Amino acid sequence: MTAFVILHYRAIDTTRSCVKSIRALAGDKHIVIVDNASPNGTGAALAEEFAASPDVTVLLHGKNDGFARGNNVGTRWVCTHLDADFTVVLNNDVEIPQHDFIPQIARIYAQHPFDLLGPDIVSVFSGIHQSPKTLHGCTLESVRHKRACVARSKNPILLLLSSGEKNSPAIWRLVQIRNRKKQHIDTTQPAEGVVLHGSCVIFSQRYLARHPEPFYPKTFMYYEMEILDWLCRQEGSVVRYDPSISVLHYQYVASKMEYRSIVRRSKFVIDCLLDSLDAAEALILASEASEPEGAQPVNTIALADA
């Protein structure tokens, strides 16, 4: 069986479309919807809608816990109630048009056993292939550098420029293409040791057996996958990207409902990202403080052969 954990917030039609796409997939599956305390009552509406559906479970979480803790509620439920070979954690604004998505996951695992697996993620907003996010995991230095850059973007003028980019698919696409070219990311080839995009990530049973709540809980939103990748590197877990499986990502649906103003939305992203970067720095510093003297840091796994 393959479990699907969908984090729901406000956008009920988007969640329904996600569920519909999963139900159309070949293979044995169970869908778990975690409602992150949607203030518009859509969590309760989904619970009533799927009450008689044996293939769907709706969990009404009592508070909006953000991405990491909200998804952890779902993965913990899967580990407790289901015998799932794989657990797919995906945003409610993701759809899976690939009919053999589930059999392909099993095929990939048989050939290349993994702890985490990421599909090719195509942004419907910009057309960009979003995964892998980067070829290199975060370090203390990179976290501090990114935090300084993000903090500068709180400048009102830079905030307006950033908001304009994100409001225009054409401009955002050009910015993302430029950034990804700098990193030499080839989304057409399988890879290991890369940072996956968090809108859709697949956990193997062996990984969730060790970490039933896989996401670092001291974040609300953003930078979760960089932190998860760092944790995986510390214990030598296998993180794989494989473009033979693919999903579509309809971005910004829930945040657009929450924040009609693109400037307010951008400020929310910046504030959350700064909090997550603070959490990442504290985690890395705590790890370094606990390392035995003379211990060598874990290196990032090299790009895998196709």
Where in the sequence are the language-model features?
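Short beta-strand-to-loop acidic/aromatic patch adjacent to the donor-nucleotide binding site
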Residues: 83-95
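Short, acidic, metal-binding catalytic loop of nucleotide-sugar glycosyltransferases
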Residues: 20-29
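A short, conserved alpha-helix in the catalytic core of glycosyltransferases
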Residues: 186-187, 194-213, 218-243
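Glycine-rich, basic loop-to-helix element that forms the pyrophosphate-binding segment
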Residues: 61-81
